[in-house]
Amino acid sequence: MNPKNSPFVLIARVRVRPGKVDDYLNIAAEADSAVQQTEPGMLMHNFDADPDDPLQFTWTEIYRDDESLIAHINNPPVQEYGKKHLELAESIEVEIYGTLADETLNFLNMAWAESGIPFKYFKTTSVGYVRDSLLS
């Protein structure tokens, strides 16, 4: 499978400022609704609460392909979420699991460096598979 056309997982760990959890849940809900309506390449988009830390949350996202991630980053409601995130959260850290094309990694390095978003890329080894039925 061409790296540009491979599905992958993105995990974003968010730490919300004390006293801002309800506000953050509101912007997360707004972003989630917009993503569901405008991003067919986002196969799964969840915002989960840490069971041990009321200020810690995790976005779990599954993308159909590289183009879907680029569309997500460029989606105006997601960009608006990013601006509000800066006001309401202490941090965000991103991890990507799967295979991305080099040009996508270059795009992420530029886009997220400007925003100060740290990310770590876990490239797929030769072990693993994706069921074709998920992409049909």
Question: What spans do the regions from the language model cover?
Answer:
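Short S/T/G/P-rich N-terminal loop/turn motif that feeds into the first structured element of a domain
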Residues: M1-F57, R64-N74, L88-S136
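A short, acidic, amphipathic alpha-helical segment used as a generic capping/interface helix at domain edges
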Residues: P77-K83
